[in-house]
Design a protein with these regions (language model features):
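IMPase-like, lithium-sensitive Mg2+-dependent phosphomonoesterase catalytic core
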Residues: 1-34, 56-290
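N-terminal, Lys/Arg-enriched amphipathic/low-complexity engagement segments
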Residues: 39-64
């Protein structure tokens, strides 16, 4: 893989992680392809979810590989209660080993989300994020100074494009239970669909955000506090912001950046809106003051 796009203080650790993923992505795909990979275990993870077999196997595989990197001090999976920490290193990884596992049995797109933090697990310390999506093809998207998209072919990641969102998109990925939506959100969604926006929600956050990114605009929303800040929300918020979009939530009717949220406990959850500028403006118009 050509690493010419990666420059600056945190480029080296991103390159190390990508190199590791490039070597291990076929093994990860093999884990997902096993006939019983989507079977549920009898366990409950720290977030209260029941993992499938592939969650646990992929988690162990990724943890071992991340810990092998000299510059990584701590590795933290959403499947674990607390981080695994080493003596040396300055970077911390928080990751969701298999986002979208609940729809994997339907053969929907799933993926691994990775957040790279410096010194502490805080939104303000997030320096880069990556995700790999697994489907009929494998893709990698990286956010550092900009957002870069790669396709996996013949054992290597090949550059596809730099992703920049347009001011206005055409797709909406609206998650959550609609009966619990606020009146403002319902009106905003009705307005979008009246303008011929297309609904593209699969139940896999990484897949839906990936769709918004590669289509160069639109909106992903999950108004209930279900998504985990460290493992899902912050990494994908950084991704959207670096692509010239907006990542936000509403606090008593006031729009605020997701990446300015505090983290009181490791598995804390948040509502989440990721959008192009136009969609963000419309949402603020309808949800302001609610």
């Amino acid at each position: 893989m050509d690493y010419k796009h990666f420059k600056g203080k945190h480029a080296n650790i991103v390159i190390e992680i990508i190199s590791l993923l490039e070597k291990g992505v076929k093994k990860a795909q093999e884990i997902l392809e096993k006939p019983d990979a989507g079977s549920y275990t009898k366990l409950e993870n720290s977030s209260g979810d029941t993992p499938i077999k592939a969650d646990l196997v992929l988690d162990k595989f990724l943890e071992e590989n991340f810990l092998s990197l000299e510059n990584i001090k701590s590795v933290f999976s959403e499947e674990k209660e607390t981080p695994v920490t080493k003596e040396n290193g300055s970077y911390l990884i928080a990751y969701d080993p298999l986002d979208g596992s609940s729809v994997m049995e339907a053969n929907f797109l799933v993926g691994t989300i990775i957040g790279v933090y410096e010194k502490d697990y805080k939104a303000q310390n997030l320096v880069a994020s990556l995700y790999v999506v697994f489907g009929h093809k494998i893709e990698l998207v990286v956010a550092l100074d900009k957002v870069y998209r790669y396709g996996f072919y013949q054992n290597k990641f090949h550059f596809i494009e730099t992703i920049v969102l347009e001011n206005k998109g055409k797709i909406i990925a609206s998650g959550g239970n609609q009966k619990d939506f606020s009146s403002g959100l319902k009106k905003a969604l009705e307005g979008f669909f009246a303008e011929n926006y297309r609904l593209r929600y699969s139940g896999s956050m990484v897949a839906d955000v990936h769709h918004v990114l590669i289509k160069k605009g639109g909106m992903f929303s999950y108004p209930q506090k279900k998504l985990r800040k460290l493992f899902e929300v912050f990494p994908l918020a950084l991704m959207v912001e670096k692509a010239k979009g907006e990542a936000f939530y509403f606090d008593k009717g006031v729009k605020k950046r997701l990446l300015e949220q505090s983290v009181e406990n490791y598995h804390e959850k948040s509502e989440c809106y990721l959008a192009s500028p136009h969609e963000a403006q419309i949402l603020e118009k309808y949800l302001k003051g609610e």
